[in-house]
């Protein structure tokens, strides 16, 4: 099965951004980083800081993952700065819609991303994944990603 990465339209980007802000808030609540009260506001602010010009923010790429039947399978947000000293691109967000999960398609989509990142001048890819997202951690390790940092927390009260 072949995949393509197609630029999101402005409307698709706005829907993606809304979903992403909500998801980032939820992930930070689950990880214990933010409280429910502050999570949405902090998530919204983080997105404003990362992509102040929305879809047109410099060196940010927002793609729909599409299969060879033209079905939208998921999304991908990549930051690739050609001037990065280590030629490292960063995956801010990647996911498949529910109907396409659990079929090995994420691996194929990530291979498509590898090719596109190389075309953009990247020599390596980095990402952040929340530790509680064990499925994603396993996928990324299987695809050759290695842990570079581990942040730990101990609850005292």
Curated annotation (Swiss-Prot):
Lineage of source species: Bacteria, Bacillati, Bacillota, Bacilli, Bacillales
Xref: PANTHER family: N-ACETYLTRANSFERASE DOMAIN-CONTAINING PROTEIN (PTHR43259:SF1), SPT10P (PTHR43259)
Protein name: Uncharacterized N-acetyltransferase YdgE
Key words, A-Z: Acyltransferase, Transferase
InterPro entries cross-referenced by the UniProt entry: Acyl_CoA_acyltransferase (IPR016181), GNAT_dom (IPR000182), N-acetyltransferase_domain (IPR052829)
Residue span, N-acetyltransferase domain: 3-157
Domain of life: Bacteria
Enzyme Commission (EC) number: 2.3.1.-
Family: Belongs to the acetyltransferase family.
Enzyme class per UniProt: transferase
GO molecular function, one term: acyltransferase activity, transferring groups other than amino-acyl groups
Pfam families: Acetyltransf_1 (PF00583)
């Amino acid at each position: 099965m072949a995949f393509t990465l197609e630029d999101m339209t402005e409307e698709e980007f706005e829907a993606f951004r809304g979903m992403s802000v909500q998801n980032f808030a939820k992930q930070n609540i689950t990880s214990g980083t933010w409280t429910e009260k502050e999570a949405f506001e902090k998530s919204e602010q983080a997105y404003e800081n990362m992509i102040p010009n929305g879809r047109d923010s410099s060196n940010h790429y927002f793609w729909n993952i599409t299969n060879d039947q033209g079905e939208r399978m998921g999304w991908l947000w990549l930051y690739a700065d050609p001037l990065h000293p280590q030629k490292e691109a960063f995956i801010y967000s990647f996911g498949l819609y529910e109907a396409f999960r659990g079929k090995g398609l994420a691996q194929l989509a990530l291979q498509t991303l590898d090719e596109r990142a190389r075309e953009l001048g990247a020599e390596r890819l980095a990402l952040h994944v929340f530790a509680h997202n064990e499925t994603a951690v396993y996928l990324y390790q299987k695809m050759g990603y290695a842990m570079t940092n581990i942040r730990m927390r101990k609850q005292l009260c």
